[in-house]
């Protein structure tokens, strides 16, 4: 896998957002064996299915009742933990980076600790959830299907000027060899500067003594 290879070579850290129903037994075992200090995994929706009746795609949006969302969140968590041998962080990334207030409420009730969405997403009442925003989408600035490195550098620099913690989102399933090569070069550059620290999303979560969630 290009993502895990790049991370290991550059001593960076990553958080894989995993779709529960898309993970096979074999891939789950392979991924679980690689989870550690530098590679973490968390829940990415349930089946990555669009339930929006109109407008932009959304699996956990306002068109779904909280009971339906609650059930999918719980089932997804249970399935993911079975496949990844219990090595799942209490973080949720909604498909298409969109979710509703009902989603946040259900996540709190189930004991999740973090919610990762686009930094510009509409505000939600997060309760006990820690916001873990994405500031830069690697796949957004493109030049002829290749990464626009100048635009990416500018976006990252601007985010670093504004924020003490910057989230960079990858789409490893659709990234090209050139994407991985460029990403590896970026990691090497950032590390060489000596002023950037790579941290896991899990490390940004507040400490907790107990979780309410049940499998």
Residue ranges and their predicted role:
Residues 6-15, 52-63:
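Surface-exposed, active-site-proximal loop segments in enzymatic domains
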Residues 60-134, 176-182:
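Catalytic domains of cell-wall/extracellular-matrix polysaccharide-remodeling enzymes
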Residues 114-115, 167-215:
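C-terminal domain-boundary segment and adjacent tail
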């Amino acid at each position: 896998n290009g993502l895990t290879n790049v991370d290991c070579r550059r001593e960076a850290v990553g958080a894989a957002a995993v779709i529960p129903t898309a993970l096979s037994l074999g891939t789950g075992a392979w991924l679980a064996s690689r989870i550690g200090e530098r590679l973490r995994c968390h829940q990415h929706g349930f089946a990555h299915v669009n339930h929006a009746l109109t407008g932009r795609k959304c699996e956990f949006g306002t068109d779904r009742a909280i009971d339906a969302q609650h059930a999918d969140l719980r089932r997804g968590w249970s399935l993911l933990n079975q496949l990844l041998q219990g090595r799942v962080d209490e973080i949720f990334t909604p498909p298409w980076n969109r979710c509703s207030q009902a989603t946040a409420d259900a996540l709190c009730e189930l004991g999740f600790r973090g919610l990762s969405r686009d930094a510009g997403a509409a505000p939600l009442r997060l309760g006990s959830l820690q916001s873990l925003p994405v500031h830069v989408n690697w796949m957004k600035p493109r030049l002829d299907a290749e990464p626009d490195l100048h635009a990416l550098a500018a976006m990252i620099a601007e985010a670093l000027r504004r924020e003490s913690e910057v989230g960079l989102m990858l789409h490893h399933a659709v990234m090209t060899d050139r994407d991985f090569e460029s990403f590896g070069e970026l990691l090497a550059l950032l590390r060489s500067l000596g002023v950037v620290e790579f941290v896991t999303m899990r490390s940004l979560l507040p400490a907790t003594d107990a979780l309410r969630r049940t499998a």
